[in-house]
Amino acid sequence: MVYDGKSHQSVARHPELANRSFVISSFGKTYHVTGWKVGYVAAPEHLMHEFRKVHQFNVFTVNTPMQYGLAKYLECADHYLNLSDFYEQKRNFLRSGLANTKFKLLPSPGTYFQCVDYTQLGIPESQLSSADFCQWLTKDMRVAAIPVSAFYSEPVESGVIRFCFAKKEETLQSAIDRLQKI
């Protein structure tokens, strides 16, 4: 997923990198089926041979019916060729809804998350840690967010949280309506 007229540049496009690179992806994240737990790895044979040695001891079983379902779904190229446009529209919808708030919108050029800085909202809650702010946002405003600090190995307080816009438009509009009241 890449937006704003840009295109993804995989390391696999460059022969000197492709020979020593893995391409890893998750169907779950891309196609809204996270519970299915289906992904894939592609690499040159010499790397795949080594990868399989490790993988066989990390995965007990596969979800075969879902693999068949995904294979059928992928027969129509539009399902994956139009993904960037699909998510870009959702991103733009959320961004335009938050444009006149005091949330500082950070760039979101290729993801289904919109990161925002909440520290300039001018409310007492804007002084909370990002984890506490997200709890307040979820409990009191009924909008879920994740602090980006949750993904750091060392505690970092940046005042940045992320919203997922891979949602139905009605869900996004409801969140926008609530966030505009802050």
Please tell me what each predicted stretch does.
Residues 1-182:
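PLP-dependent class I/II
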